């Protein structure tokens, strides 16, 4: 296999800047890998070869002219989850209702990537409107896990994770509403980070649940993820939920972690996120990771988060409620698909026909649940109570951080499950987000870093590291130190 596509992003960037490799060569190598393998994995919904090569050529011209490059990742190609708007590519969000739709504007994340000189290879597959845990809810067919094509790559951002694992791209962008970056990262042995809520702009990120959604970086190493995090983070006046605070030095933290130990770092193990219901191999991998953190000098203790028990129920009331509001905009008048527009139907009938044909079953399910939870007779009993539980979960984590610096848990309760195994059992699918969604409810930051392969089935397992809001640098210090001590893992292909 081409050594270019197996290189990490930091190495590629250094070689491009040193004129040892051109960005066009690196981008073409990734495009060739996509062409050779994506029929098998279906990680991409749209490939933008000409646009990517054009952006790469601009970087090469700057290198040749001796100009200062716009970012430490200039020239390194990237895969973008199809939930971020792009003027030069379709944005479908994995849904038929947006089939062929092109946005009139770029998302802020897209704009920052372009300004950083990062060629965008294309848009990756995802569960429809980011609702799902397996990428099986995409209207355009499921993505397959490169570790085992009969298994799911996780979701909703399985396309971005699979693209990394299949060496189709060295970098990727995802979005995380209840674990959609971290969970696929765990199932594909890649690194995924959910930044602190509000630190990466949501402008142009098509909303699923506005108080939970957060864009974030994905890569194959902690340092690469940090370099990408630094590119996309920062305050944005176009996003009313954007936090006007300095971006932590995540790159410096990653470098320090990789070069040092964890002496003095206090690590908490969440009592509620281990034990019954977890696959034995996942627990074994997690316990080994905790032992490794201890060997690095970390002070490990158990922390109690009693309201995590109610996180799943609260999440699956809050999220559908926001979904039912956000997806009301897809009314057959302004976007994409339109059914029954032949003059024989009223506007209401056109809307009903279009939404019935354009939305998949999981999206319809969540719209109905959310509409019910927000209805006059049930608002206080369901939605209001869920928001109170959300506050208690955030307080649990705040209390934990009084005695520890980071909290750790398995990233998922099991390894990747089989394609079709849970698609007809929504509750089983929802339970798969058990480890990741409390963090979204609290608005804090989290990372999944590979912790090896399960002895049960030889499939990847992820270690989840969590930190308080605006302490994203702690994730990178601990994650990089653990990654260096763990050593290299074999790849999927």
Curated annotation (Swiss-Prot):
Keywords assigned: ATP-binding, Ligase, Nucleotide-binding, Protein biosynthesis
Biological process (GO), any one: translation
Gene Ontology CC terms, in alphabetical order: glutamyl-tRNA(Gln) amidotransferase complex
Keyword field contains Aminoacyl-tRNA synthetase: no
Enzymatic reactions: L-glutamyl-tRNA(Gln) + L-glutamine + ATP + H2O = L-glutaminyl-tRNA(Gln) + L-glutamate + ADP + phosphate + H(+)
Keyword Nucleotide-binding part of the UniProt annotation: yes
Family: Belongs to the amidase family. GatA subfamily.
Protein name: Glutamyl-tRNA(Gln) amidotransferase subunit A
């Amino acid at each position: 296999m081409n050594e270019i596509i197996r290189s990490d992003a930091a190495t590629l960037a250094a070689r491009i800047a040193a004129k040892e490799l051109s960005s066009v060569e690196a981008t073409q190598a990734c495009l060739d890998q996509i062409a050779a393998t994506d029929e098998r994995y279906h990680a991409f919904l749209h490939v933008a070869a000409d646009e990517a090569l054009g952006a790469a050529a601009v970087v090469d011209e700057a290198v040749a002219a001796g100009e200062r490059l716009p970012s430490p990742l200039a020239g390194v190609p990237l895969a973008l989850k199809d939930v971020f708007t792009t003027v030069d590519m379709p944005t479908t969000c994995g849904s038929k209702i947006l089939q062929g739709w092109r946005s009139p504007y770029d998302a802020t994340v897209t704009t920052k990537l372009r300004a950083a000189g990062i060629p965008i290879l294309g848009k990756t597959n995802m569960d429809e409107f980011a609702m799902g845990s397996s990428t099986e809810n995409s209207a355009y067919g499921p993505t397959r896990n490169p570790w085992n094509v009969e298994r799911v790559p996780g979701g909703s951002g399985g396309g971005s994770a699979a693209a990394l694992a299949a060496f189709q791209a060295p970098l990727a962008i995802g979005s995380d509403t209840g674990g959609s970056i971290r969970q696929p990262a765990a199932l594909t042995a890649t690194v995924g980070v959910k930044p602190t809520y509000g630190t990466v702009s949501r402008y142009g990120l098509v909303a699923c649940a506005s108080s939970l959604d957060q864009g974030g970086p994905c890569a194959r190493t902690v340092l690469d993820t940090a370099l990408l995090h630094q590119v996309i983070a920062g305050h944005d006046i176009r996003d009313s939920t954007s936090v006007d605070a300095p971006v932590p030095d995540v790159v410096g933290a990653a470098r320090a972690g990789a070069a040092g130990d964890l002496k003095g770092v206090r690590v908490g193990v969440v009592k509620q996120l281990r034990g019954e219901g977890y696959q034995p191999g996942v627990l074994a991998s997690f316990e080994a990771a905790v032992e490794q953190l201890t060997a690095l000098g970390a002070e490990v203790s158990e922390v109690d988060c009693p309201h995590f028990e109610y996180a799943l129920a609260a999440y699956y009331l809050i999220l559908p409620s926001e979904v039912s509001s956000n997806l009301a905009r897809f009314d057959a008048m302004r976007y994409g698909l339109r059914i029954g527009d032949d003059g024989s139907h009223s506007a209401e009938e056109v809307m009903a026909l279009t939404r019935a044909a354009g939305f998949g079953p999981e999206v319809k399910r969540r719209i109905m649940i959310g509409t019910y939870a927000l209805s006059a007779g049930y608002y206080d009993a369901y939605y209001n109570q869920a928001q109170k539980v959300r506050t208690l979960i955030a307080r649990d984590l705040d209390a934990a951080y009084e005695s520890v610096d980071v909290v750790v848990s398995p990233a998922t309760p099991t390894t990747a499950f089989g394609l079709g195994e849970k698609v007809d059992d929504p509750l089983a699918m929802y339970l798969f987000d058990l480890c990741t969604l409390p963090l979204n409810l609290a608005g804090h930051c989290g990372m999944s870093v590979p912790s090896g392969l399960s002895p049960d089935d030889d499939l990847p397992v992820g270690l989840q590291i969590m930190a308080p809001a605006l302490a994203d640098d702690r994730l990178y210090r601990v994650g990089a130190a653990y990654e260096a001590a763990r050593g290299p893992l074999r790849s999927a292909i």
